[in-house]
Swiss-Prot record:
The lineage of its organism: Bacteria, Pseudomonadati, Thermodesulfobacteriota, Desulfuromonadia, Desulfuromonadales. It comes from Syntrophotalea carbinolica (strain DSM 2380 / NBRC 103641 / GraBd1). The keyword Heme does not apply. GO terms for molecular function: metal ion binding; metallopeptidase activity. Keywords: Hydrolase, Metal-binding, Metalloprotease, Protease, Zinc. It comes from the Bacteria. This is UPF0758 protein Pcar_0065. SUPFAM superfamilies: RuvA domain 2-like.
Length: 227
């Protein structure tokens, strides 16, 4: 197989990222950029090495918690590459533990997922959080609304919008986790989101999104057309 440098430019992971953004790359392509080189002994490219890592570990989370010895068990992964992988995953964990700060601007569901994934993914109960935003989508305050099964009796519009009024927020964004690990919205999720949207409209407060966090991904109800 030809080396990555000999591929058509629009197929090379680095050029693809520069032209289309990191979101356009597969997990294997992102890993290839971290690894930078393949295994000369086997003739594997960096992309091949990325695919081998994905085959060995069922999920990125398992890969992120692997020891250097476990990473080096993959052909072509030596101490240097194992250390680079662990450094990247540790940075991701530290980023995920950093709370959003007042003044931080809401930019995308992906950014919210990146901030809350590490905090919420291991919780055994559902946590419902409201992010209160100003007219420029900058964070005013993060408010914990409830903990437990998500039902209308636990997430009441009065409890949600009282801090919105106190902070004079122009918009609000909701985040909650699914302990099952599957971020697919339940009927209750959809019903509560619709109810909160209607109350927000009456109060002149924009409900920007409701983002559900799972083990390996998220669902944005705004992207789904619910909001």
């Amino acid at each position: 197989m030809p080396a990555i440098k000999d591929w058509p430019e629009d197929e090379r992971p680095r050029e693809k990222l520069l032209h289309r953004g990191a979101e356009a790359l597969s997990d294997a392509e992102l890993l290839a950029l971290i690894l930078r080189s393949g295994d000369a002994a086997s003739g594997h490219s960096a992309l091949d090495q990325g695919r081998l890592l994905i085959q060995q570990f069922d999920t990125l989370r398992q890969m992120a918690t692997a020891t250097t010895s476990e990473l080096q068990a993959i052909k072509g992964i030596g101490p240097a590459k194992a250390a680079e992988l662990q450094a990247v995953f540790e940075l991701a964990r530290r980023f995920g533990r950093n709370p959003l700060r007042p003044g931080d601007r809401y930019t995308s569901p992906q950014a919210v997922f990146a901030h809350f994934h590490e905090r919420l993914r291991d919780h055994k109960r559902e946590r419902f959080i409201a992010l209160l935003l100003d007219s420029k989508n900058r964070l005013l305050r993060e408010v914990g609304i409830s903990e437990g099964s998500l039902t209308a009796s636990i997430v009441h519009p009065r409890d949600v919008f009282a801090p919105v009024v106190r902070e004079s927020a122009a918009a609000v964004l909701f985040v909650h986790n699914h302990p099952s690990g599957d971020p697919s919205p339940s009927r209750e999720d959809l019903d509560i989101t619709q109810r909160l949207r209607e109350v927000g409209e009456l109060m002149g407060v924009r409900v920007l999104d409701h983002i559900i966090i799972g083990d390996e991904g998220y669902v944005s109800l705004a992207d789904r057309g619910v909001l």
